[in-house]
């Protein structure tokens, strides 16, 4: 047996070489530049052994094949030429694997992503496990890049151009059965026989070539290709609004390879990779990736977490049902739901059933796995089954006396160590804990709706919350698959506080006569997933505006909204999508059509709806207020760092990730430019735009939020 630090070569008695991949000291296999020499040494031994019948690449890790290339390698590149060279080195290594004279099989279990999939594509065949952990994809676009080790050229030839474009442009990950159907893998087997199945495949002298479906063959021809690429360019431009240069380059590179041959395609891929690596968009997206990775490792406090074996939930409504699902089905923890009536419990159980049944229908999980996960959730109209719960999450109405009553009941009916976590979005945690016998075990845990989709949670300790309570709550959030940030117990916390002025300004422009669709389109063009008016419709106009009075009472007039407008809309029974009446028209459920503004909205608020501002002016008015408030939160230590502020905004409200978050964006603009812009807007629109003291100080001292010690690199 010959060993290297990350790759182990073992030639079996049946003359099949098994190359086991195991990056030492790491939970996950990633490809690093220094591994190239190790792989080449193994490939040399394989070429020299004339008795070999085949080769199998397999991971020695428990639940991943190769999760991608080490992104830190890109950060070490000083210019586009160095990044291009990095890509060419990867291409050359993959070409050497593909050129081996015997069948080469990739045996895949777990994540096979980015450079890992490019390596698998260089193998002659791929076989994977039917495990839920097994996913295959090329997610480089999410970092503002494209696959740089041959992925843009091999994937279209393997699965067809339309499937490849869809995978590479979106970064989507395919599960085992989806990969088999697409032709990405040749077989799907149980994990227990993965190696033997791969060895048997490697022994076959002739590996039959897969024929592409008729549709893909037509699209690969000159006429079909021209039509497809024209359509894809148009759709991609609509989706990205020109904010993500990687998508355009991906299309160009794939088209070059198909039209001019793979040699030209590989050359175009390497050049595009080098250029994209130096773009501000890729640098920002990589910064978000590293920041989110750091946040996920952050324990929240220096204290060790307490026990976390079971959870209780008070309230079986929309939020309670969603929290139950992420706790049981993602966290694997037993959940007991208490509601005042059985209808609430049934609603919460159905919520989880519907989500799990969708997974079964899509073949993501099997029916027995659905039943196993659902069995973790139970309910009661009293506190039976709560005595041993380690943490109880309260998800009842936003009513302070009611929440204080919940604290008292939990302290009476649960264990002495039980933590009480409130899902409040607006009430101070200190007030909720005011009458608590054990205030050190009361904390805020603010989820965003819909719970199963939104990745962020805010963990909110009040003045008396213990360090262990913080650590335990952060641990739970991570188990639930969430990205937690710890924020201070101040009105609006962080996310809602920076979102409110953004929404307020959109409503104010509406009262000035700007059209709904013009306001929303301007912010989508800026980079938000949806505009502020549509966002209000989606979360519920009543829900989205109820925090405004709380913020106005705490921080003054800068949070005041055109109250008569909001009241007029709510008095007209307009709550948004949830009751089919909002700023937009809602047709029959299930029908997909372009969103149309309800023309009655203009009459309701007494304007004609004629836009006068440019899209840039609309976006500037909304975004600058959000940035100014984020800077205040930094100054007041509502957030612990610029990192947390960026992650909170990107994951909590969809702040454009290609800008890196509000603090990286402010650093890019420069504090001097921020202050000058805010002063200009204040002169035009009033004192709500006055730059906060933090920005003025930073402009004077030429400081930045992200200090020089905080790099874009991962640790």
UniProtKB/Swiss-Prot annotation:
Keywords: Cytoplasm, Fatty acid metabolism, Isomerase, Lipid degradation, Lipid metabolism, Lyase, Multifunctional enzyme, NAD, Oxidoreductase
Pathway: Lipid metabolism; fatty acid beta-oxidation
Annotated spans, Enoyl-CoA hydratase: 1-190
Any one Gene Ontology cellular component term annotated for this protein: cytoplasm
UniProt-listed Gene3D superfamilies: 1.10.1040.50, 2-enoyl-CoA Hydratase, Chain A, domain 1, NAD(P)-binding Rossmann-like Domain
One Pfam family per UniProt: 3HCDH
Keyword Repeat: no
NCBIfam families: FadJ, PRK11154.1
HAMAP family, sorted: FadJ
Protein name: Fatty acid oxidation complex subunit alpha
Taxon lineage: Bacteria, Pseudomonadati, Pseudomonadota, Gammaproteobacteria, Enterobacterales
């Amino acid at each position: 047996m010959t060993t290297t630090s990350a790759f182990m070569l073992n030639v079996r008695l049946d003359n099949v070489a098994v190359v086991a991949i195991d990056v030492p000291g790491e939970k996950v296999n990633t490809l690093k530049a220094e591994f190239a020499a190790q792989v080449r040494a193994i490939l040399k031994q394989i070429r020299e052994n004339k008795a070999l019948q085949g080769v199998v690449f397999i991971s020695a890790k428990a639940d991943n094949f190769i999760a991608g290339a080490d992104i830190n390698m890109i950060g070490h590149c000083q210019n586009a030429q160095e990044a291009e060279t990095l890509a060419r080195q990867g291409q050359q290594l993959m070409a050497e694997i593909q050129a081996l004279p015997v069948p080469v099989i990739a045996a895949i279990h777990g994540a096979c992503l980015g450079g890992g999939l490019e390596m698998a594509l260089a193998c002659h065949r791929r076989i994977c496990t039917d495990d839920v952990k097994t996913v295959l994809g090329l997610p480089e676009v999410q970092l503002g890049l494209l696959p740089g080790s041959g992925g843009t050229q091999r994937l279209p030839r393997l699965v067809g151009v339309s499937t490849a474009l869809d995978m590479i442009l979106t970064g989507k990950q395919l599960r085992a059965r989806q990969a088999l159907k697409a032709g990405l893998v040749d077989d799907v087997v149980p994990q227990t026989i993965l190696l033997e199945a791969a060895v048997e495949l490697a022994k076959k002298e002739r590996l039959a070539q897969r024929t592409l479906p008729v549709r893909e063959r037509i699209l690969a021809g000159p006429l079909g290709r021209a039509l497809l690429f024209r359509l894809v360019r148009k759709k991609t431009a609509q989706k990205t609004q020109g904010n993500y240069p990687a998508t355009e380059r991906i299309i160009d590179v794939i088209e070059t390879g198909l039209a001019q041959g793979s040699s030209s395609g590989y050359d175009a891929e390497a050049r595009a990779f080098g250029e994209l690596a130096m773009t501000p968009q890729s640098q920002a997206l990589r910064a978000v990736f590293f920041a989110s990775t750091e946040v996920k490792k952050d324990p929240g406090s220096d204290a060790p977490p307490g026990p976390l074996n079971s959870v209780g939930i008070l309230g079986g409504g929309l939020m309670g049902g969603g929290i139950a699902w992420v706790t049981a089905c993602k966290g694997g923890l037993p959940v007991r739901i208490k509601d005042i009536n059985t209808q609430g419990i049934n609603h919460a159980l159905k919520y989880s059933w519907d989500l799990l049944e969708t997974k079964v229908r899509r073949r993501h999980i099997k029916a027995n796995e659905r039943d196993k996960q659902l069995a973790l959730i139970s309910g009661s109209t009293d506190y039976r089954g709560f005595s041993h719960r380690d943490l109880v999450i309260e998800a009842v109405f936003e009513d302070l006396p009611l929440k204080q009553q919940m604290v008292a009941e939990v302290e009476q009916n649960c264990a002495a160590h039980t933590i009480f976590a409130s899902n409040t979005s607006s009430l101070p945690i200190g007030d909720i804990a005011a009458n608590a016998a054990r205030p050190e075990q009361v904390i805020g845990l603010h989820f965003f709706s819909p719970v199963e989709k939104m990745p962020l949670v805010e963990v909110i300790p009040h003045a008396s919350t213990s360090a262990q309570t913080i650590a335990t709550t952060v641990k739970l959030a991570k188990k639930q698959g969430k990205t937690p940030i710890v924020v201070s117990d101040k009105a609006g916390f962080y996310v809602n506080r920076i979102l409110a002025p953004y929404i307020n300004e959109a409503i104010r422009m509406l009262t000035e006569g700007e059209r709904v669709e013009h306001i929303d389109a301007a912010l989508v063009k800026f980079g938000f997933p949806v505009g502020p008016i549509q966002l209000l419709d989606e979360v519920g106009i009543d829900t989205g505006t109820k925090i405004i009075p709380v913020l106005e009472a705490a921080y003054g007039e800068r949070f005041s909204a055109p109250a008569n407008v909001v009241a007029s809309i709510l008095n007209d029974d307009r709550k948004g999508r949830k009751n089919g009446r909002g700023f937009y028209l809602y047709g029959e459920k299930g029908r997909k059509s372009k969103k149309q503004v309800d023309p009655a909205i203009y009459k309701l608020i007494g304007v004609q709806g004629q836009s006068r501002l440019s899209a840039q002016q609309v976006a500037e008015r909304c975004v600058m207020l959000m940035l100014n408030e984020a800077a205040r939160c930094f100054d007041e230590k509502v957030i612990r760092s610029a990192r947390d502020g960026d992650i909170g905004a990107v994951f909590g409200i969809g702040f454009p990730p290609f800008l890196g978050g509000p603090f990286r964006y402010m650093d890019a603009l420069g504090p001097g430019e921020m202050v000058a812009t805010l002063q200009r807007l204040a002169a035009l629109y009033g004192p709500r735009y006055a730059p906060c003291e933090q920005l003025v100080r930073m402009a004077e001292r030429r400081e930045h939020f992200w200090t020089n010690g905080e790099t874009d690199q991962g640790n």
